[in-house]
């Protein structure tokens, strides 16, 4: 049986930490940035852990 390939879209969107958590980029930093406060932009620019409900699917897509 051939090896399972890593999902290209998931590979670009998620990063796995050393402890095994999956991190994702928050939405809302692509456009209309002039109307958002610096405080809000700083908060949106941080990586966020993936929800537990999505973790199982994401791990499968990443081949983990």
Curated annotation (Swiss-Prot):
Q: Which GO terms describe its molecular function?
A: structural constituent of ribosome
Q: An example Gene Ontology cellular component term from the record?
A: cytosolic large ribosomal subunit
Q: Which keywords belong to this entry?
A: Ribonucleoprotein, Ribosomal protein
- Tell me which Gene3D superfamilies the record gives: 4.10.410.60
Query: According to the UniProt record, where is the region Disordered?
Result: 22-44
Q: Which GO terms describe its biological process?
A: translation
Its protein name is Large ribosomal subunit protein bL35
Q: What is the lineage of its organism?
A: Bacteria, Bacillati, Actinomycetota, Actinomycetes, Micrococcales
- Please state the gene responsible for encoding this protein: rpmI
């Amino acid at each position: 049986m051939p090896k399972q390939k890593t999902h290209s879209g998931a590979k670009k969107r998620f990063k796995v930490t050393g402890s095994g958590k999956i991190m994702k980029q928050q939405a809302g930093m692509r456009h209309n940035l002039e109307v958002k406060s610096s405080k809000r932009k700083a908060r949106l620019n941080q990586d966020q852990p993936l929800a537990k409900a999505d973790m199982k699917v994401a791990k499968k897509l990443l081949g983990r």
